[in-house]
Amino acid sequence: MDYIAKLTAIAKSHGGIIETRISEQHGISKAMLYNLCKEDKIHRIVKGQYILPDDMQDELLSISKRSDRIIFSHETALFLHGISDRTPFEHTVTAPSGCIPSAAIKSECKVYYIKPELFELGKTTLRTPSGNNVPAYDLERTICDVIRSRNKLG
């Protein structure tokens, strides 16, 4: 059984990222992923996510796959809309109040919180520079968020 061929197909159909749960659905166990990682046949991004050695990591896609309760906002949304030509040093996401993003998300992103009833307002899908779709706020919502948070922006 050629695990690398299976993982290559998984990566190709999921934006270059191999998730543990998806590989298990294809008959590749966590232990096998661990062994392949030790052999340098795949690289671990964060818990539950891997990439092939020759692939470039799409950081935005990786972050968005870690939680369905975050949406790219503020500076990151401006970048995705093409308004800012500078890649943000720290990505910004918005989560509903009461939702606690993982430590991995908090360490890589600035997290803003919003009332749950306003969380989905203005949600759309945008393409990353690598060509993958991620959730982000539309331009109108992004501009409102930037103005509302202008004293907190870095």
Model feature map: region roles:
Residues D2-K6, I28-A31:
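N-terminal amphipathic/basic helix or basic patch
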Residues Y3-K6, S13-I22, C37, I45, ...:
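Nucleic-acid-binding surface
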Residues Q25-K38:
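Short amphipathic alpha-helical interaction segments
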